[in-house]
């Protein structure tokens, strides 16, 4: 589950609900631990009692952004934090687009929930297509810049997904005994603001949200 660092309240809430329910339904949520969609998806997966994986663009001992050290520890306890870079490697900008190929490679399906036309999540989407992975995008407001990237993906053939069931239904037969939609009936969605706060992530319903320490 990937997307922009900036986000609208619509994008944040749908990201949280979908990642939460995907985790309950048996999916492992993979993302990059960045601000915005990445951290929301990881926190939601943990709240859903599921597994989550974070792929870093830095050394394993250099968590970036630093505000997500607490979240990184939570991810490690519920899945894994991994990187191809040696310890001590700083988070240079060029590392993140390269890192995105690993996120796509580890995934059976990639969901982009919020993206401008310049979002790095579109790089992950291109890797997913090149690797033959399922590609989903969340439809949004066509005049919102944070939805222009997802609109582009939909025009280029990505599947529309507005809830976790859209993805789980498509993969239930491929993962028998793992994907289970009935679990969604037993577990209501956790409260987003409270869950994000427990991971050290501030949410104020803005398009750009300063993260707490």
Please name every model-derived segment.
Residues 2-213:
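Glycine-biased, small-residue-rich flexible motifs in mid-sequence functional cores and linkers
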């Amino acid at each position: 589950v990937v997307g922009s660092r900036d986000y609208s309240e619509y994008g944040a809430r749908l990201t949280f609900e979908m990642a939460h329910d995907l985790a309950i339904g048996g999916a492992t949520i993979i993302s990059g631990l960045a601000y915005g969609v990445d951290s929301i998806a990881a926190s939601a997966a943990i709240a859903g009692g599921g597994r989550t994986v974070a792929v870093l663009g830095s050394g394993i001992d250099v968590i970036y952004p630093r505000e997500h050290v607490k979240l990184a520890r939570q991810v490690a306890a519920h899945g894994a934090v991994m990187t191809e870079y040696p310890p001590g490697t700083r988070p240079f900008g060029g590392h993140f687009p390269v890192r995105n190929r690993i996120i796509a490679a580890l995934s059976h399906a990639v969901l982009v929930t919020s993206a401008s036309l310049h979002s790095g999540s579109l790089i992950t989407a291109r890797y997913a297509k090149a690797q033959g992975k399922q590609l989903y995008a969340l439809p949004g407001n066509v005049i919102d810049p944070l939805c222009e990237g997802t609109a582009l993906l939909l025009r280029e053939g990505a599947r529309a997904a507005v809830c976790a069931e859209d993805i789980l239904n498509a993969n239930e037969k491929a993962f028998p005994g793992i994907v289970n939609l009935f679990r969604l009936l037993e577990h209501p969605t956790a409260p987003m603001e409270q869950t994000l706060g427990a991971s050290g992530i501030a949410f104020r319903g803005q398009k750009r949200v300063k993260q707490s320490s």
